């Protein structure tokens, strides 16, 4: 999919953005629903777009779960999964309506996975036990990039990497 975006972006008037874990934040993820609620028939495309964007988060969750299952089958143990990035967009500390946070909360709620949550733009969290990405040092068996924070571009690991935000491209 990335190759198609790169090819299309060679055209001078095209700028397709890198898809991420989903659409988040306190505006874009929420405001369209106000319009849809008032003009239901006229806003079918807006409703469909939001539903598709919301589905992307579910797809990411399933991809992480299937990778974890394959790791477990191959190694006879559960993997440690590092989820890198919890904010709703790169290089901020705002978790409001964050699809990356939804991924983390869904996996935490299932209580089946050993998770390391990493958000370099937050020093601490009252709700989450955050790990320092610089100290992962091979602790994780699977690294899932959920948000393209600048810190993650140079992060190197020998483990399985799932890049959902284009930080490694």
Question: Can you say where each PLM-predicted feature lies in the sequence?
Answer:
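Structural/interface elements that position substrates and couple domains in central-metabolism enzymes
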Residues: 1-169
